[in-house]
């Protein structure tokens, strides 16, 4: 139990959006809340969660729990990306490219939160199409998951890392 608490303590958690939703029934409307969160260790691990409950704190707690269970590893290169990447989910498309030291995170809203908790310090990015936070987060994580490290590319091509990096 203490190991889990320690691990959770080193994760950065960010709340991206809280939304009130309603279900219409015969007797009127039933209100509930949704929460979108991202968690990351600031060193290449990131995950997102979407929770729904009758109360805001419960929705946030559910979202955080789902985010911790739904984490992926991202191969970063000294605080930036390995190469330009594209990602998409439904109507949202994102494009991200590596940036030199000192550039910072040039990204908007939901995409910025994902990149911050993932440990990316320098990146240029743009979201196209729908800017719905849930879809932008999914598209960003899709792009990060599709990023290949030089070691992976070298192994696939049967070359050395030095040949790949030029």
From Swiss-Prot:
Gene Ontology cellular-component annotations: small ribosomal subunit
Pfam families attached to this UniProt entry: Ribosomal_S5, Ribosomal_S5_C
Keyword Ribosomal protein set for record: yes
Family annotation (InterPro entries): Ribosomal_Su5_D2-typ_SF (IPR020568), Ribosomal_uS5 (IPR000851), Ribosomal_uS5_bac-type (IPR005712), Ribosomal_uS5_C (IPR005324), Ribosomal_uS5_N (IPR013810), Ribosomal_uS5_N_CS (IPR018192), Ribsml_uS5_D2-typ_fold_subgr (IPR014721)
Molecular function via GO: rRNA binding; structural constituent of ribosome
Location of the S5 DRBM domain: 11-74
Keyword annotations from UniProtKB, A to Z: Ribonucleoprotein, Ribosomal protein, RNA-binding, rRNA-binding
Gene Ontology biological process terms from the UniProt entry: translation
Gene3D superfamilies per record: 3.30.160.20, 3.30.230.10
Note on domains (UniProt): The N-terminal domain interacts with the head of the 30S subunit; the C-terminal domain interacts with the body and contacts protein S4. The interaction surface between S4 and S5 is involved in control of translational fidelity.
Subunit (UniProt): Part of the 30S ribosomal subunit. Contacts proteins S4 and S8.
Homology family: Belongs to the universal ribosomal protein uS5 family.
PANTHER family on file: MITOCHONDRIAL RIBOSOMAL PROTEIN S5
Function text: With S4 and S12 plays an important role in translational accuracy.
Protein name: Small ribosomal subunit protein uS5
Species, as recorded: Actinobacillus pleuropneumoniae serotype 5b (strain L20)
Source species taxonomy: Bacteria, Pseudomonadati, Pseudomonadota, Gammaproteobacteria, Pasteurellales
């Amino acid at each position: 139990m203490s190991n889990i608490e320690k691990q959770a303590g080193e994760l950065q958690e960010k709340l991206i959006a809280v939304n009130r939703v309603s279900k219409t029934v015969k007797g009127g409307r039933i209100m509930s809340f949704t929460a979108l969160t991202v968690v990351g260790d600031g060193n290449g691990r990131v995950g997102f969660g979407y929770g729904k409950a009758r109360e805001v704190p419960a929705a946030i707690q559910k979202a955080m729990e789902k985010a911790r269970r739904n984490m992926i590893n991202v191969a970063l290169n000294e605080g930036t990306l390995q190469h330009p990447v594209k990602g998409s989910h439904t109507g949202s498309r994102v494009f991200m490219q590596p940036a030199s030291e000192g550039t910072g995170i040039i990204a908007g809203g939901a995409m910025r939160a994902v990149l911050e908790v993932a440990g990316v310090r320098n990146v240029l990015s743009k979201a196209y199409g729908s800017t719905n936070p849930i879809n932008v987060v999914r598209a960003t994580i899709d792009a990060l998951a599709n990023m290949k490290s030089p070691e992976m590319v070298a192994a696939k091509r049967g070359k050395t890392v030095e040949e790949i990096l030029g």
